[in-house]
Amino acid sequence: MQTAENVEHLNFQAEAKQLLRLMIHSLYSNKEIFLRELISNASDAADKLRFEGLSDTALYESDPDLKIRIAYDKEARTITISDNGIGMSRQEVIDNIGTIAKSGTREFIDSLTGDQARDANLIGQFGVGFYSAFIVADKVTLTTRRAGLTTEHGVRWESSGEGEYTLETVEKRDRGTEVVLHLREDEDELLSSFQLRSIIRKYSDHITLPIIMKKEVWDDESKAYKISDEEETVNQASAIWARPKNEITQEQYDEFYKHVAHDFEPPLAHVHARVEGKQEYIQLLYIPAHAPFDLFDREHRHGLKLYIKRVFIMDDAEKLLPGYLRFVRGIIDSNDLPLNVSREILQESKDIDSIRAGSVKKVLGLIEDLATSDKSEDQEKFKIFWREFGQVLKEGVAEDYSNRERIAKLLRFTSTHDEQEEQTVSLDDYIARMKPEQEKIYYITADGLKAAQSSPHLEIFRKKGIEVLLLHDRIDEWLTANLNEYAGKSLQSIAKGDLDLGKLEDEVEKQEHEKEAGDFQELTAKMKEVLGELVKDVRITYRLTESPACLVADTHDMSGNLGRLLKSAGQKVPDSKPFLEINPHHPMVQRLKYEEAKFADWSHILFDQALLAEGGQLEDPASFVRRLNDLLLQNILSGK
């Protein structure tokens, strides 16, 4: 860092430079958004001033009329966006403007693919905000003063976006922020009142602050329009959510979504409702068309804004919606909460609990409408919703007991019914196809669809034509631990506990199984002795029709798949041993009944194969290979 007089020269972090280059390249085809982003920042600054002004009216400095001004200068080739919002101190400029790189920046950059359309969406989700100015400007000058600080505490930030920026302390009479864009050579088309007004009305008409521009008047002498001193408001400057629904176009709904969500695509669906009665509030809630890159970061909750009587209060969505709906964007505006409400009061507020419950009801209702609609457009939207947010919605089964049945009804899975990759099977679909004598909903969990489809546990179910749900999302182990039944039918893992097919198994089969258990009792006891602490026990199975053996967890033990998931997350896994179940009709098992010399090797190979078949890892792969090679060599030498 160099210091010369009052000017500091500082460098961007390397990742920030890279992100700036990527952003300018990826977003250039949608360059108009620079104005939307800068107006959004100005609007946020006004919201913050209103909020802080509730407890300290002196911050208004005798200038309570909040507005945003847009101006341009053809000769200087500049566009200026200014506001009289909260402004920034020197440290806030460094924190908010001087530091573009935030946690996750490196991982975010690595996720970019070179596909311009996809990368533009990802960059929008990451939040470019102020830095979108560099799409059209080769130099940006920001001058600001925080409300409450004296005029000599102004700060000027300047950068060409190439790797460094300068900071200096300046005199600034008015509070707020002014951003001057020095346009690139090929951006002169933006130096037009008509063009700027068009962009403002397209992207920022819903901003509740007036956006002011000077009028242009015709000058007879020069035969051209000239900028006058008279000002006018360009946007509607009214809260879109407070207007009647029939006065709002779909395009206006979409543009407001892009403003609150910092997205470039229209949303998938929205719900706009005015709630009256004990509680009075307005909801305008959106479901995005794609998941944000940080969807699985449960700590990041800034999608939903709370307003009280049109005054922004907070965007801590945890108080307003449960974690499993963290993808929802939009606003809630209450007429009942006191304006000076604190976050602590909100945490304990029954009014907030009521608003939260009402919002959950609306969002689930919106998803249900898509799921049950006869319209192909809505059906396609639900498919997109499930693909993007289905795993997160599954969290609700554990988190939201009061809505568990509604959430369960929305869940979608793959199954052995058609075995397609897309998750389209609902629990109601499964129940409708159950055999008349079937009492349970059968499922299997695995770490991937292929692993689930090829599981040996499915063999008896395929033979009998019984459908099994194939659960292969990481969240599914948590889901099934919290969803024990649905519509009066219990859910049963086919890889845990004793196999109980109930009325699906006839008396002849039961008698045959009992006889086989007796016939193989000596063999199973001998195998248990050889395998020792690797297994809880060895027993005859009725699950298998083709494979020689499989592993089964005890009823109340953790499944092998869950144990592997926890281990991969670095968590401690409680000790539990599986049952080894062997197929009495398989040639390998029948041979083992009469094997003496290589009995231990055959027993270990059956166990290791069963472990591999369920996706497990061998503790000693070298011993497995040695045993297998010995047995193969023995067969070759014996001519078998």
From Swiss-Prot:
A GO cellular component annotation in the UniProt record: cytoplasm
Gene3D superfamilies documented for this protein: 3.30.230.80, 3.40.50.11260, Heat shock protein 90, C-terminal domain, Histidine kinase-like ATPase, C-terminal domain
Annotated segments matching region A: 1-343
Keyword Transcription: no
Annotated GO MF terms: ATP binding; ATP hydrolysis activity; ATP-dependent protein folding chaperone; unfolded protein binding
Primary location: cytoplasm
Cellular location(s): Cytoplasm
Record's keyword terms, sorted: ATP-binding, Chaperone, Cytoplasm, Nucleotide-binding, Stress response
Renumbered residue ranges of the record's region B: 344-564
Pfam family, one: HSP90
Chain segments carrying region C: 565-640
Quaternary structure, from the entry: Homodimer.
Similarity comment: family membership: Belongs to the heat shock protein 90 family.
UniProt-listed PANTHER family: HEAT SHOCK PROTEIN 90 FAMILY MEMBER (PTHR11528)
Known role: Molecular chaperone. Has ATPase activity.
NCBIfam families recorded: PRK05218.1
Name of the protein in its database record: Chaperone protein HtpG
Name of the gene this protein is made from: htpG
